[in-house]
Amino acid sequence: MKLIAELCQNHNGDINTLKDMVVKSAESGADIVKIQSIKANSLTKREEYESFRKYSDEYERLSSLELSMDDELEFIHTAKANNVTPMTTIFSPNHYDYYNSLGYDYLKLSGYSMRAFDYGLKLDKFNFKHLVFSTSSLHLHDIKKCIDNLQGVDFTILHCVCLYPTPFEKLNLASIEHLKTLHDKIGFSDHSDNLLSSKQAIFQGIDMLERHFTILDEEETRDGKVSVTPKELQELKTFSNYTKEGQYLTLNGFDEQQRFNHEYYQGRFKW
């Protein structure tokens, strides 16, 4: 299983913080490190969402997080120097010349970006080896349509819920089992605020796990609440390396109260 450290916006636009994140995630067991290639000038203004998130405020925020081409090249170099695969999420699918010039082997499209197929997205214009797309905001018929559009492409589907953090009752990890019937490479982009859901998905046999990653305090970044620390990322990597039986025993281990109850009920009646 490949473990993605999603660095997202947790670098706060600082290249040195970003490079430190790459090193720390590599040391913690990440196979892939991912950023988000956000360009503020591609942001659209929609009046119906101004009360939810004002355009001017969002533009200013994204501008402060934007990475230059030189920053992205340095990110790629740092990743490769630390033996992890660099990856990015693209938000402007028509800017293929930009991404091709950077040389990413792994690209990601979010669920809502996959609808770009309806507007003429041509993946054959991109130079990449593997594509990842998440199911956030996609209905089942949309997912099937994406699979049809990706014939001949090496890709992984990530089960994903577009809630930050995702409450337990909304995780719907059973979806992973159904996605396995549609495609052979299935993963999970986990936006929960714990490790249990990730471990459960690993036990279910996913091929790829994505977790937001931070080296800063939770309150210092926008995605802090759904981000794992280096220690937590290492815990997930260690769990993924267990045998299936080892994973089962870890997930189903008895705590002190369970052991007490077991011993109590075991001797409760005479045989």
Task: Go through each PLM region and give its residues.
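Catalytic cores and adjacent flexible loops of soluble metabolic enzymes
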Residues: M1-W271
